[in-house]
Amino acid sequence: VAATAGAPGRIPPVFRLVLAGAAVVLLFFGQRLQNPQPWSYDEYYHLGLAREMLSSGLRMESFRWTPFSITFDHFADGEPLFHVLLLPFARLPLQTAGLLGVLLGQIFLVGAFAAALWIVRAPRPWWFVLALGGLGTLFAQRMEMCRPHVWLIGFSVLVAALLVERRWKALFVVCALFALAHAGAWIAIPLAILWSLSGLLAHDGPGERRVPWQPVAVAAGGWLLGQLVHPDVPENFRLFVITNFVIPFQATTASNAALHSQLGTELSPPGLDLLLEQWPAFIAPVLVAIALLSRPQLRSRATLTVGLTSLAFLLAGSLVIRRFFELGAPLALLALALVAREWWARRLPPPLPGWGRMLAGTAIVLGILWTFLGLRAHGVQNASAPLGMAAWLGEHGVAGERVFTAQWGDSAPLFYFAPQLQSLVALDPTAFYLKDPRLFAAYVNVVSGQDPDPARTIRERFGARWVTIPPSLYPRFLNRLAHAPGAQALYGDENYWVVDLGKR
């Protein structure tokens, strides 16, 4: 084995890497333990879908709970492997199942990152693993959620490491599993293309200035295999187009004002204040950029591929869709590890003799403190607000009845607590808009308080008996509905009201 982390000619102690990974997992999981309720509305959906799979099997042709969504007509699970991994504890109480799902994702991501560092023989890899704890609040919030995006990040890091070391067989297997774990797994293909093309710019020697076909073929072949063994083939290919192209396009172009008004924060850019709070995540990419610009000999296939990819995701996450930021931050950390590897291999003088370890340790500690103090200062994302409302409807709603959710995201907790009911759309409002743009416009008209008779519209056009309203978010709609004949508020707490419009 070639020289690895620690010093040239010496393999770093594995236990340091394992201990660093365990420390980071404990750090993140300890934060979730302090706030064990769901941190994201999507957690209700994923845990509910896994529980449903235990009864109906892995293949579902229709998501019958949301008749106004395109998934009602054609359903494909975008993350079947993720949901299979949730099956063993899907029937446990929500809080317990959510904690176990979060822990599983944290172990995978941290383990994948540590494995990637080991694969590429990064110097002192435990430092980079510890730095995962200080990448800012956006990345930390993602780590605290039982959602498949955590697995997207872990698989992406593994793909990058296997490309760097040209382990084609392992890359094929990882890409196939990646395709089953997340609908966005196709990003392995452009990553492989970039790796092939980066040799034209790299300073790896004349023999490396070529464009090999193996990485692209292997990545594409592995991804395609995953799609072909998908339980929902061929509908998964339709889902692939909608998830990766239609939804991001609609989110970034504001082509429809009604749809744009309902998009979640993850599909919008972060504000300047929030972006500035992520300063720990910018340390690694800034160092990578400085090193590659000032030291041409450090521009290898590895550093260019991972460095440029991380910068692209960070830029997109900062300016367009914040979800990309969470992927760019750990990739930038891996890019910094690769730059450090090149630095060691070329025996370049230390940039800060005698100060490197102290500065690295200080930056890691400050990043961790800033990240977790920031989480406490902002408070956790309040995804537990609909618990009482959804549980009440689970007890009082009759099978086949329909719920009009003022906030479309409430379909997810209703799916978990009241699976006998139907609602509007789960996960993304674009699925509602694509099925019936006019009806979607009517929905937006109702919840914005512009419809003069919302009760009639809800009864006649949506066929719903129940209406769920967060009163602080929709005061005008609530005021109009309160004056509707026959409307009764049967449940209320500080977060939600449930209004009964009467049986049809």
Enumerate the language-model features and the residues they cover.
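Transmembrane catalytic cores of multi-pass membrane glycosyltransferases
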Residues: 38-42, 54-57, 183-296
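Short hydrophobic/aromatic helix or loop-helix immediately within or flanking a transmembrane segment
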Residues: 68-96
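Transmembrane-helix motifs of polytopic, lipid-linked glycan transferases
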Residues: 100-122
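Membrane-interface alpha helices of multi-pass inner-membrane proteins
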Residues: 136-140, 157-162, 169-184, 188-192, ...
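Membrane-interface transmembrane helices that cradle and orient dolichyl/undecaprenyl
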Residues: 156-170, 203, 288-298
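Signature aromatic-anchored transmembrane alpha helix within multi-pass, membrane-resident enzymes
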Residues: 219-224, 334, 338-373
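Short periplasmic/luminal acceptor-recognition loop of GT-C membrane glycosyltransferases, typified by
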Residues: 397-437, 460, 464-474, 499
